[in-house]
């Protein structure tokens, strides 16, 4: 498989018919291939997220990250856009689902698509990946330390981020969860509660929690980065999407 890719900014139709900015990367070799919607974290549509999109393309998947903040802050820097959206209460859940649906529709229409779409998110994006998988017919979902699925957040958390564990019966696809045992949001107790509920419901899922890792252990540009956990996590992501997306 060649790792040659093409990456570009595109426009997709999101929630309510809104045209929103998105970052697309895809392999240059032919399909058929599965696709991945990358949901950016709370810090926004930033260079690290775009690098992740390109990483998926280099590994054989068409990948697309919608800019969830493009309505409120078109053209703003990721930091400024994130700060403004947080001050407005965050991204409403209904709008998030509509934007992911639009991104999935865009990916399925690409030449070479095999019709299968997964979703992945880190931090708030992990919660959003779970939300999307409980709201849309997807083929796979990866939640990387997504908080506030089970629990209410502290005062600094955007008002839109309410617990969504009640949506678990609607989970439409297999779920991979990757967590740090030293994380506080979500803490091990919240991870265990989500695991217990999905097991009770008979929902296919696999969770892995890493010793010595806290929130953001995938982030190579942050002090929270933990190479061993991140490398193993990526290995599990490739295996999971290989099985579920083809």
PLM ranges: what are they?
Residues 1-246:
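N-terminal cap/leader regions of alpha/beta-hydrolase-fold enzymes
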């Amino acid at each position: 498989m060649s790792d040659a890719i093409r990456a570009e900014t595109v426009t997709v139709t999101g929630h309510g018919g809104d045209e929103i900015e998105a970052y697309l990367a895809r392999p240059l070799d032919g399909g058929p291939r599965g696709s991945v919607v990358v949901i950016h974290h709370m810090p926004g549509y930033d260079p690290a997220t775009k690098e992740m999109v390109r990483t998926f393309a280099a590994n054989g998947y068409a990948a697309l990250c919608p800019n969830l903040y493009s309505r409120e802050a078109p053209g703003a820097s990721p930091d400024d856009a994130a700060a403004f959206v947080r001050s407005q209460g965050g991204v409403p859940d209904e709008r998030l689902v509509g934007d992911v649906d639009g991104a999935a529709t865009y990916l399925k229409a690409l030449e070479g698509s095999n019709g299968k779409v997964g979703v992945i998110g880190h931090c708030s994006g992990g919660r959003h990946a779970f939300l999307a998988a409980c709201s849309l017919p997807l083929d796979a979902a990866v939640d990387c330390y997504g908080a506030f699925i089970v629990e209410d957040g502290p005062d600094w958390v955007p008002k839109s981020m309410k617990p969504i564990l009640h949506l678990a019966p609607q989970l439409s696809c297999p779920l991979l969860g990757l967590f740090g045992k030293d994380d506080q949001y979500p803490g091990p107790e919240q991870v265990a509660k989500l695991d217990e509920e999905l097991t009770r419901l008979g929902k296919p899922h696999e969770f892995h929690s890493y010793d010595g890792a806290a929130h953001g252990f995938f982030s190579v540009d942050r002090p929270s980065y933990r190479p061993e956990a991140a490398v193993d996590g990526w290995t599990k992501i490739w295996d999971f999407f290989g099985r579920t997306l083809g």
